[in-house]
UniProtKB/Swiss-Prot annotation:
Biological source species: Saccharolobus islandicus (strain M.16.27)
Entry-linked SUPFAM superfamilies: FMN-linked oxidoreductases
A GO BP entry: isoprenoid biosynthetic process
Chain's role: Involved in the biosynthesis of isoprenoids. Catalyzes the 1,3-allylic rearrangement of the homoallylic substrate isopentenyl (IPP) to its allylic isomer, dimethylallyl diphosphate (DMAPP).
Molecular function GO labels: FMN binding; isopentenyl-diphosphate delta-isomerase activity; magnesium ion binding; NADPH binding; oxidoreductase activity
Entry binding sites for substrate: R7, K8, S96, Q97, R98, Q160
Annotated protein name in UniProt: Isopentenyl-diphosphate delta-isomerase
Lineage, opening ranks: Archaea, Thermoproteota, Thermoprotei, Sulfolobales, Sulfolobaceae
Keyword field contains Membrane: no
Length: 368
């Protein structure tokens, strides 16, 4: 087995310090316009950003999606993120826990999260390929118990695996059969998330047919994991690097993925993530059809700078979200989900080509 721990460190180093954010790709969120209301009918002070994350109430409709863990220095990053998200009442996901299941010394870098964040929702994380490789109920329960998780994310990352030097692109259909059986035995919900390339309506429908109702888009336009693996390939002189260059804009853009999942699985719980870089992006994702927005890379970068930097980042994000709510007359998150929007440009073209009737979709996104 390759050294997963060193790979985790290299992933964080490349993500934080190389140019991989939105490289050669777009979220399409620029094509979502929130309609300004000159007389909002509310005051800024009465805006309520609280919402539900499964069984728990959260302060803001934003979560930190999983990214890291596995070594002491990564545990320190997780600790900072956990302390700050606890302070702000924001859910936190951890990175893949495979390393902690297979290497006991890696467990503390994940377990620290619950120790410093006793009340917020914490989301465990395992990869779909591990189901093919033999993971089952025992490993899922271990990942959940390790951090006393409120949910577990199962990540899809076929594009990353294809271009990873030591990748394991194993996605046989029986993995979904195993996942369906495991979900029936777990005490917490499963969220299926992508890893920077988005969830299409075909994938959403397939997952739904196996009992999955919770999704995290992780769409194109944010952290480019193909680019991260391309850089790792280049460092190793791996011939895959040249091929990876041709796939840097591969995937379903975040805004399109939100629409595709909401349209095809209207009753889903949906996290809109992938290139969410501001509170305005978060507001657009929610107005477009997500229940909450998710972000990882900007949180990671701020956490590396320190606790104060991350606190300031969240204050900025929350202010921008509330500003968007104020200027659309949305006094709470449910109102934001129903606020008037205009869909333009490439996103409109994408939706129309994919058979999404915009008038019908407007009712679907408002949950009417």
């Amino acid at each position: 087995m390759p050294d997963i721990v060193n790979r985790k460190v290299e992933h964080v180093e490349i993500a934080a310090f190389e140019n991989v954010d939105g490289l050669s790709s777009s979220t399409f969120l620029n094509d979502v316009i929130l309609v300004h209301q000159g007389f909002p009918g509310i005051s800024f002070s009465e805006i309520n950003t609280k919402t539900k994350f499964f069984r728990k109430e959260i302060s803001v409709p934003i979560m930190v999606t999983g990214m890291t863990g596995g070594r002491n220095e990564l545990g320190r990053i997780n600790k900072i993120i956990a302390e700050v998200t606890e302070k702000f009442g924001i859910p936190m996901g951890v990175g893949s826990q495979r390393v902690a299941i297979e290497k006991a010394e890696a467990r503390e870098s994940f377990a620290i999260v619950r120790k410093v964040a006793p009340t917020i929702p914490i989301i465990a994380n395992l990869g779909m390929p591990q189901l093919v490789k033999g993971y089952g109920l025992k490993e899922f329960q271990d990942a959940i118990q390790m951090i006393e998780a409120d949910a577990i994310a199962v990540h899809l990352n076929p594009a990353q695996e294809v271009f990873q030097p030591e990748g394991e692109p194993e996605y046989q259909i029986y993995a979904l059969e195993k996942l369906r059986d495991i979900s029936k035995e777990l005490s917490v919900p499963i969220i299926v998330k992508e890893s920077g390339n988005g969830i299409s309506m075909e994938t959403a429908k397939l997952l739904y047919s196996y009992g999955i109702k919770n999704f995290d888009t992780s769409g194109q336009g944010g952290t480019n994991w193909i680019a991260i693996e391309m850089i790792r390939d280049i460092r190793r002189g791996n011939w895959k690097a040249e091929s990876a260059k041709n796939f840097l804009n591969w995937g379903v853009p975040t805004a399109a993925s939100i629409m595709e999942v909401r349209y095809s699985v209207p009753d889903s719980f949906l996290v809109g993530s992938g290139g969410i870089r501001s509170g305005l992006d978060a507001a657009k994702a929610i107005a477009l059809g997500a229940d909450i927005a998710g972000m990882a890379l900007p949180v990671l970068k701020s956490a590396i700078e320190g606790k104060e930097s991350l606190e300031q980042f969240f204050r900025k994000i929350i202010f921008e979200l509330k500003a968007a709510m104020m200027l659309t007359g949305s006094k709470d998150v449910n109102a934001l989900k129903k606020t008037s929007i205009v869909i333009l440009g490439k996103l409109k073209e994408w939706a129309e080509y994919r058979g999404i009737n915009l008038s019908t979709y407007d009712k679907v996104r408002k949950r009417e």
